[in-house]
């Protein structure tokens, strides 16, 4: 890709996750799930809103809940790679949630290059597989049927457990990262995934990616994660019903990660992006 251009901007208050299929963008907005037609990015169209899909964070103090807020000023600060988390608010000027969602700016270019399906990374809460959207709330996996984009419907809700954070599909399975462990579900039946196994760890934030019967999980400390561990775990999935830890590697404050052909890319807080050769799981090599 050469010379990428900013051709538009959609103002979606409090949005943290998106997925795209057939030029329909699905996103969270506060507690709601919304769908926007982006066939013409200069003239996007609001399609539908499903209310109260997500929970609003109650803050980092377990003994207090957040019941509201006021925006008093705008503060711009640099953010260290990997420090963002889905359980906190960043207050910026924004339109009220009941106002229509419209492009803020765009170029005259009418073309678009959006793909036909959504692809999520290690921090994604959304995943589109065929005609279904999988969405994680803090305790549930919710499945939506996208065959009718004008009126997509909830197909199933599967209660998983507390602290769900990320979803990663691989080889007809779903790998769910939570603050207490990794859950594995068989997804051959797209509307009724079946539980296969879990791998437990201490309470910590937990993105996950998978390749070649191995899962790569980062654990990090932080105010929202309430954990004390900062490490990369490599997990053996040869027996998918009994995942086993191969080895843990200490890190600074790891967050998102990606893998391709045994090369692992890992965002490690203030130390930035790190690249590892993970051909040998028990002896990974730092590349740069």
Regions found by a protein language model. Name each.
Residues 1-288:
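Feature marking well-ordered beta-strand scaffolds used for ligand recognition
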């Amino acid at each position: 890709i050469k010379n990428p251009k900013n051709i538009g901007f959609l103002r979606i208050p409090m949005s943290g996750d998106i997925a795209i299929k057939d030029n329909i963008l699905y996103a969270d907005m506060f507690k709601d799930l919304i769908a926007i037609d982006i066939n013409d990015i200069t003239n996007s169209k609001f399609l539908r809103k499903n209310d109260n899909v997500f929970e609003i964070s109650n803050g980092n103090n377990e003994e207090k809940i957040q019941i509201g807020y006021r925006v008093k000023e705008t503060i711009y600060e640099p953010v260290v790679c990997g420090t963002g988390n889905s359980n906190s608010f960043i207050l910026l000027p924004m339109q009220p949630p009941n106002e229509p969602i419209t492009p803020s700016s765009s170029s005259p270019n009418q073309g678009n290059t959006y793909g036909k399906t959504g692809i999520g990374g290690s921090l994604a809460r959304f995943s589109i597989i065929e005609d279904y959207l999988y969405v994680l709330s803090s305790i549930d996996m919710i499945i939506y049927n996208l065959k009718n984009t004008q009126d997509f419907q909830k197909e199933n809700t599967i209660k998983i457990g507390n602290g769900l954070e990320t979803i990663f599909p691989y080889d007809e399975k779903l790998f769910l990262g939570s603050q207490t462990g990794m859950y594995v579900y068989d997804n051959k039946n797209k509307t009724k995934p079946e539980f296969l196994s879990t791998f437990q760890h201490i309470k910590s934030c937990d993105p996950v990616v998978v390749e070649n019967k191995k899962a790569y999980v980062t654990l990090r400390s932080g105010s929202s994660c309430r954990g004390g561990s900062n490490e990369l775990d490599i997990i053996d999935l040869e027996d998918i019903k009994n995942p086993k830890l191969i080895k843990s590697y200490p890190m600074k404050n790891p967050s998102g990660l990606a893998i391709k052909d045994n090369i692992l890319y890992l965002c490690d807080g203030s130390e930035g992006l790190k690249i590892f050769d993970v051909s040998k799981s028990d002896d990974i090599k730092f590349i740069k």
